[in-house]
């Protein structure tokens, strides 16, 4: 890369072009074709699950997960407020449910202490589930996002979900490649430990199919239902009979070809992400009060994919938006972290708890360039520009 340094872009090469050409020359370019099934099998093997259901986006994957899990109108779902809004809408408003927003801890992931506090002190546990004392609604599920590829505290969150009779939905849309390497969950990949998990192949993710996603579940019937819903709920394909409302959430054969090529390169992408993260951290941590926010590492029993890098400005005296503008002037694309979802136009009346850290990180984070084809020289240019702010 030279000149403009983008935030996060696809890394395609000859392999992706060759694989996609196979689909094009065969004529199987749409949602039918053998490569979709082949990609599903490869994904399932990579994350260590018996089955993966391909979809056309991470958002649709989460919608399928919510429906397969039985979340319905009138339910409530505990969700993080510091995340992309597509992590919340499909689990709540798409299916008629309402969110309960919870802030983050220093991993940027949902705070287990705050989740526990809400369940213990704002709800009543009954034989058939957990009920919100304020609204009387059943709190049916807990949505967990592995933010920027950093593993959430799954042992704690799984325990909370079990004790309070909550379905646990993992949003691993940013965390493909992240897994536990030690401890009680050793070998488990992000997205595979809850009741159902979802992933994304958007263009800015660690690997991409242009757009796409997939669903895995520890309940075989949930995965089967997700597949059924994604294909317009066809009960009889020949006679065009449908047994419920379904959706066109299918992945195309061309996308699956891109995915197969990218999956073969994924471990190399993870290595590059770690190398550039280490380069940023060694050069910028502590300079002028700046910090590169940490990921859980091997010493914590986790192999992180280091998807997005966060420069933390609080102790530097620098203004977030000024930093973004000055770097943009030098041809370096950065961005702020997401606006909190409980402050978005559609959610001002929903309950929200333990927001202080999320508000702080919203104000002081700048995400730095992190493409898997970001070179050491590109990274040095970003570092020099940051040091000269």
Tell where the protein language model's regions lie, with residue ranges.
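Hydrophobic residues at beta-strand termini and immediately following loops
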Residues: 55, 102, 368
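PLP-dependent aminotransferase class I/II
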Residues: 37-41, 49-52, 113, 125-137, ...
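Buried hydrophobic packing segments
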Residues: 61-66, 87, 91, 213, ...
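Active-site PLP attachment segment
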Residues: 192-230, 253
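Structural detector of well-ordered beta-strand residues that form the stable sheet scaffold
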Residues: 53, 78, 100, 168-169, ...
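PLP-dependent aminotransferase-like
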Residues: 67, 71-147, 151-163, 167-172, ...
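Conserved PLP-binding active-site segment in aminotransferase class I/II-type PLP enzymes
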Residues: 1-68, 72, 140, 144, ...
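Conserved active-site segment immediately N-terminal to the catalytic lysine
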Residues: 170-207, 238-243
């Amino acid at each position: 890369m030279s000149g403009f340094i983008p935030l996060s872009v696809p890394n395609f090469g000859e392999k992706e072009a060759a694989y996609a050409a196979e689909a094009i020359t065969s004529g199987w370019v749409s949602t039918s074709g053998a490569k979709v099934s082949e990609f599903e099998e490869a994904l399932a093997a990579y994350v260590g699950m018996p089955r993966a259901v391909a979809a056309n986006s991470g958002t649709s994957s989460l919608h399928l997960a919510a429906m397969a899990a039985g979340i319905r109108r009138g339910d409530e779902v505990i969700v993080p407020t510091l995340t992309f809004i597509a992590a919340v809408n499909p689990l709540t408003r798409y299916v008629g449910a309402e969110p309960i927003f919870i802030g983050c801890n220093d991993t940027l992931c949902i705070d287990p202490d705050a989740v526990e506090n809400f369940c213990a002190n704002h709800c009543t546990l009954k034989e058939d589930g957990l009920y919100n004392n304020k609204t009387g609604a059943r709190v049916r599920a807990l949505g967990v996002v592995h933010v920027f590829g950093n593993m959430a505290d799954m042992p704690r969150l799984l325990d909370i979900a079990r004790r309070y009779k909550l379905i646990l939905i993992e949003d691993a849309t940013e965390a493909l490649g992240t897994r536990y390497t030690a401890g009680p969950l050793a070998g488990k990949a992000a997205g595979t430990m809850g009741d159902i998990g979802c992933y994304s192949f958007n263009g800015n993710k660690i690997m991409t199919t242009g757009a796409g996603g997939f669903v895995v579940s520890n309940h075989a019937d949930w995965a089967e239902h997700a597949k059924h819903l994604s294909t317009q709920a066809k009960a009889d394909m020949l006679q065009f009979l449908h047994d419920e409302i379904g959706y066109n959430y299918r992945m195309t054969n061309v996308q699956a070809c891109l995915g197969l090529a990218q999956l073969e390169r994924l471990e190399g992408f993870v290595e590059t992400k770690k190398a550039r993260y280490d380069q940023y951290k060694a050069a910028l941590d502590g300079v002028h009060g700046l910090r590169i926010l940490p990921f859980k590492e091997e010493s914590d029993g986790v192999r992180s994919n280091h998807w997005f890098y966060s420069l933390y400005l609080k102790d530097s005296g620098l203004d977030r938006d000024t930093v973004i503008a000055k770097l943009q002037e030098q041809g370096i694309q950065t961005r702020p972290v997401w606006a909190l979802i409980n402050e978005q136009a559609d959610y001002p009346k929903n309950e929200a708890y333990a927001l202080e850290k999320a508000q702080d990180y919203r104000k002081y984070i700048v995400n730095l360039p992190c493409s898997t084809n970001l070179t050491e020289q590109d990274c040095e240019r970003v570092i020099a520009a940051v040091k000269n702010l």
